[in-house]
Amino acid sequence: MIAAFFDIDGTIFRNSLLTEHFKKLIKYDLLDFSEYDRRVKEAFKLWDERVGNYDNYLGDLTGTYVDAIKGLPTKYNDFVADKVVELKGNKVYAYTRKMIKWHKAQGHLVIFISGSPDFLVSRMAKKWNADDFCGSTYHTDKSGILTGEISPMWDSKNKLKSIHKFCEKYQIDLDKSYAYGDTHGDITMLQLVGNPKAINPSLELLNSIKSDKKLASKTEIIIERKDVIYSVDANVKTIDSTF
């Protein structure tokens, strides 16, 4: 069986599902904005002005998010998760939207593997007709209250474990399979398959691809800006953004 493994945030979705969920929780007065303002605002400002690191912003955001949703009842969380995918689920890259449809038409398995919360990943998987999915598990107690305990899926080590589980479940031929990712957390996913695609890759991911001769030789790099989609190889020239 041939599979196509897709990361979601920054690969399919043009933003972060966790970010959108966080904003909606604040909008519906389920979380205190002051915590976001105190812990995340400055990191976002630096990233937004392109003088800060996106990973630092996401790290601050994720930590704040995990702390903030502790104690939130599942019924409220599910309501907001539904709204996020209903209102934002179509904000995807044209290239990966096209490739999801292409893989389905070829009879390939489409599998979403994301570091976003499983309750968001499951909804995106359903919306885009994915065959299976895996996200970060946000645990609840017996009463359906979020505990703040997480089994993460945003790092390369855990994504590797998930792919091996999917391979056993579906008898996947990795040499013929595809993977799509945008950050260094996707590196093992790209290394495992015969057809890796880096979508608007971060500098860290791009440098990792360049330093791995085997991976560099088989990776297609896709850059989508405005209404143009570019396809380049790992030898693409980059320009230092610090002046």
For each predicted feature, which ranges?
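A metal-dependent, Asp-based hydrolase signature
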Residues: L17-L18, L30-W102
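C-terminal cap/substrate-recognition subdomain and adjoining C-terminal extension
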Residues: M1, V80, E86-F243
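Asp-based phosphoryl-transfer active-site loop
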Residues: M1-L18, L190
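Non-catalytic pre-domain segments flanking phosphatase-related domains
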Residues: M1-I8, K23-Y36, D240-F243
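A residue-level signal for conserved active-site and pocket-lining positions in enzyme catalytic cores
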Residues: G10, N77, F133
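Active-site catalytic microenvironments for nucleophilic, acid-base chemistry
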Residues: H21-Y28, K127, K169
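Catalytic cores of large soluble enzymes that bind and process phosphate-bearing ligands
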Residues: F13, I69, D155
